[in-house]
Amino acid sequence: MYSLPHLSIPVSHKFIFESLMSNQRQTQYVDGNTLTVENLVQFSTGKFILNLTPAAWAGVAASRKIVQNILDSGEVAYGINTGFGLFSKVVISPDKLEILQDNLIRSHCAGVGTPLTRNRTRMLLALRINVLSKGHSGISTLTLQRVVNAFNADCISVVPSQGTVGASGDLAPLSHLALGLMGEGPMWDPETGQIGEASDIMKRNKCVPIKLKAKEGLAMIN
C-alpha cells in the first residue's frame, strides 16, 4: 500500500492525510500556499473533496472586488476591458466583456493528440483551483465555487496531451480544461469512465457550468 511520508503542516490548514487506498473521501483545504506534491498525488485519485480555507475565500472575494471597482469606474485595464496581445489597446464595450472571455477560451482550444488520463487531468484541475485560491486572479467566488464543485463531482474535462509550449502559462491545456467547465466540448463521465458531452455530464451530476465574467477567462488560463 502506498502511504504518504510524514509532512509537517499547520493544523489550521486542516489537511487530513490518508493513504491512497482509502475509500473514504476526505475534505482537503487549499489556500494557494501550502499544497505539496504528496497532496497533488492524492487529488489525482478522485478520492478527495477540495475546498478553500476561509481566509482563501476572503482573498478571492477581495480580489474580485478590485476588478469590479475598475469596471464600475470605467478605467481601462488590460485583460479586464481590453483585448489581448496585439489588441491590448482596444477597449471592449461592457456588453461584450463576457463573450470576449468565452471566445478567449474557445480560441485557445488548439490541443491535439491522445487525451491526458483522468488522474493527470484531476491534478491539472486541482492545481488551477490552488492557483486561483491565492486571491490574485480576479475570479469571482461564484465561478471558483462552480469549478470546485465540478472537481468534487469528478466532472473532469478532456484535455489533449499535445499542443502547448508553456510560454505564457499552458494556454491550450488550460483552455480545454475551462471549456468543459463551461459545459462545452468533451468530458470524462464519472460513472462510466468514458468520454461524453460536457453539457450532459454536468447536468446529470448537478453541476452548473461556469459563466465567465470580465477577467475570468484570463484567470482560468494565465
Region roles according to the model:
Residues 9-222:
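Conserved, well-structured ligand/cofactor-binding cores
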